[in-house]
């Protein structure tokens, strides 16, 4: 199986600008390629894992990645289908860019990676040059046909967001001309921007050897967006989402989804994935595929040490049937792996659920209590006025809050 065929088998290729040329380039040559990450937030999410896996697979094949962090495009914002993006300040955009670059460097550790920030060149273009030299080369009708733009026409789209496509096209041209990048990689939602970049290179350089690939949008089996838990977006930054929450998310992936996730989100070889697929069909209760998926992802985005902490946390939470069975050393680890709220005073359960992010609001917290889904250790709490005090603690310090079977948090006095 060729490298291109492996990418197809892994469901990592949705669109190709020229399949014959892309296949030849990836299978028989060494190519410099780029993938962009806009710093719209302070952290990557697990939704970025599709692109990261693709980068790692390309590296393993000997191809050379250029990672573009969009310090400039992050100031503009790629058009959303539903609403106008809130503009970031220059300071926030550059801070986010630095944070995301740091995360990517940790994930792509010991790999040959070149990092660039498009603020370096896009900030140097004055408005007259932008309109005369580049705006002239973009057809409005073509831009209006792009999916995200077309979706927004009825409600309205600003010229700022409308111009995003031109800026991303300029990125591809700059990297093609100055860094010898021939291939752009992006999600399927970026396909319109990728093809616009190819067209700009053709017009400015009179060449047609630049190429583009898009990866599919990864959805859960119910059609919802991949990478969100009950609490919201799963961030790579451990201070924004605990590694244990990500561990739990992937450990509970359904049998319908797990094999596709193994293909698209890990570097596990084909034969091993096929064996895991067979085991899932014959012995689904063992959940070997889910365990392999979880272990690979936590090790990739965090570390093998953090993986062991997550495994140990799971053992502690699911092996202690009674409050008295916990040991004090268990809580030393739980403070590292669960979301914790520290307090010196009694706290209403409703407030504690919000503070520990087990509920998004007091009204939601009350609904959870009414539905009998809230426990202190393993005792169900049914009173809306219940207050957590030192009397509820273990070792005069710790209270374990549970919502349902899988969501846990810690109150520390």
UniProtKB/Swiss-Prot annotation:
Residues spanning the membrane: none
GO MF annotation: an example: RNA binding
Sequence motif: 'KMSKS' region, positions: 225-229
GO CC list: cytosol
Catalytic activity, EC: 6.1.1.1
Name of the protein described by the UniProt record: Tyrosine--tRNA ligase
Protein family per UniProt: Belongs to the class-I aminoacyl-tRNA synthetase family. TyrS type 1 subfamily.
Keyword DNA-binding in record: no
Domain of life: Bacteria
CDD domains in alphabetical order: TyrRS_core
Cellular compartments annotated: Cytoplasm
Biological role stated in the UniProt entry: Catalyzes the attachment of tyrosine to tRNA(Tyr) in a two-step reaction: tyrosine is first activated by ATP to form Tyr-AMP and then transferred to the acceptor end of tRNA(Tyr).
Catalytic reaction equation(s): tRNA(Tyr) + L-tyrosine + ATP = L-tyrosyl-tRNA(Tyr) + AMP + diphosphate + H(+)
Binding site for ATP: 228
Enzyme class: ligase
All copies of domain S4 RNA-binding, residue ranges: 347-413
UniProtKB keywords: Aminoacyl-tRNA synthetase, ATP-binding, Cytoplasm, Ligase, Nucleotide-binding, Protein biosynthesis, RNA-binding
One Gene Ontology biological process: tyrosyl-tRNA aminoacylation
Assembly: Homodimer.
Binding-site list for L-tyrosine: 34, 164, 168
Keyword Protein transport: no
Residue ranges annotated as motif 'HIGH' region: 39-48
